[in-house]
């Protein structure tokens, strides 16, 4: 069995995927690199096959009809032989020194008595034109030791475990029934959210591992693109609302974190609907909040009466301007767009 499987969802990625693949190859025989060609129209499939030929036993090319990012991740989970699993998008990469430290620690943890469910490391926003890179650290978590939710501190606003920071135990992803929707953007939020109640033991290493590239005009986190795909953001938001009755999550720290995560996703949905400026999207905003209210009145009041919820729901044009100002401030803090 391999120690760590990397899945690289790849769609028309010929211009940048090799940088990603090359950053993962130093893992050698400890790792498995699954390049999932999601029905690409360019040379992505050819490049994937070329690396499979060059690095047999390490790189595998998987070809499928286009199913979107979520189905590419699903294919990775289905085909993974590693004890642990990580998604690396084809325009991102990893830092060599942090990578070597993580592999060494995973080897140690794999041979221990405690089953590790989730490994967390920092990620860096590699934003074009920005000299000082924002690093997402997790100061509320114990460092360099296995811990449980009981030992975790409270996450600050703007501190979220994203796909970029997490390595899951592969079997946990299968056992929790994770199946991401096809042809849908923003499913990475479901990827990190759904397994959380199944996570018992975690480990955090304060190293800047994952390099998250931001800057392509067609990127899904580009604000203009997000507004154009707002129906998919709302779909993901509703799936997350439906997934759990958060009031039944027994561990208070896990419950608090999951409320915060659902809150920021709902804030992003709401503010994109406001920023679009169309009456149709303002109606979708009202419908989203009605959906939450009809689904769980306590959840509605919890989200609505928080600082973010209040800022997002101030009435009239003046209220919408304040909402946008609050969003711009949170954007600088969180760096989610």
Regions found by a protein language model. Give the residues of each.
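A conserved acidic beta->alpha catalytic loop
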Residues: 23, 37-46, 68
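Short beta-strand/loop segment that forms part of the nucleotide-sugar
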Residues: 30-39, 60-65, 89-90
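Short aromatic/hydrophobic "clamp" motif used to bind/position activated sugar donors
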Residues: 85
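Glycine-rich, basic loop-to-helix element that forms the pyrophosphate-binding segment
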Residues: 64-80
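Nucleotide-sugar-dependent glycosyltransferase catalytic core
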Residues: 184, 198-236, 276-283
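Short, well-formed alpha-helical segments that are part of the catalytic scaffolds
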Residues: 12-26
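Donor-binding/catalytic cores of nucleotide-activated saccharide
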Residues: 69, 93-202, 218-226
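Membrane-interface aromatic/basic loop that binds lipid-linked glycans or pyrophosphate carriers
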Residues: 275-337
């Amino acid at each position: 069995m391999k120690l760590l499987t990397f899945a690289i969802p790849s769609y028309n990625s010929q211009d940048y995927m090799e940088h990603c693949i090359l950053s993962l190859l130093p893992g050698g025989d400890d790792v498995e690199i699954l390049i999932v060609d999601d029905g690409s129209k360019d040379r992505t499939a050819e490049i994937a096959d070329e690396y499979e030929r060059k690095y047999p036993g390490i790189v595998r090319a998987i070809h499928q009809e286009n199913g979107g990012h979520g189905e590419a991740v699903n294919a990775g989970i289905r085909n993974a032989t590693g004890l642990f699993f990580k998604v690396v998008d084809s325009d991102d990469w990893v830092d060599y020194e942090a990578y070597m430290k993580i592999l060494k620690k995973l080897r140690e943890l794999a041979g221990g008595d405690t089953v590790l469910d989730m490994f967390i490391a920092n990620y860096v926003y590699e934003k074009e034109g920005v000299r000082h890179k924002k690093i997402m650290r997790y100061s509320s978590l114990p460092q360099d030791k296995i811990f449980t939710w009981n030992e975790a501190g409270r996450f600050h606003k703007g501190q979220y475990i994203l796909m970029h920071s997490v390595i899951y135990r592969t079997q946990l992803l299968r056992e929790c029934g994770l199946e991401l929707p096809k042809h849908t953007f923003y499913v990475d939020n479901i990827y990190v959210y759904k397994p959380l109640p199944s996570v018992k033991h975690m480990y955090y290493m304060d190293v800047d591992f994952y390099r998250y590239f931001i800057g392509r005009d067609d990127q899904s986190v580009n604000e203009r693109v997000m507004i154009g795909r707002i129906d998919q953001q709302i779909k993901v938001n509703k799936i997350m609302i439906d997934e759990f009755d958060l009031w039944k999550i027994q561990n208070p720290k896990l419950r608090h974190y999951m409320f915060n995560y659902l809150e920021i996703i709902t804030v992003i949905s709401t503010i994109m609907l406001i920023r679009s400026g169309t009456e149709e999207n303002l109606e979708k905003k009202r419908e989203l909040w009605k959906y939450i209210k009809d689904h769980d009145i306590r959840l509605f009041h919890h989200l609505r009466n928080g600082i973010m919820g209040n800022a997002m729901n101030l009435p009239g044009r003046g209220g919408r301007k304040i909402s946008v100002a609050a969003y711009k401030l949170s954007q600088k803090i969180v760096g989610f767009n």
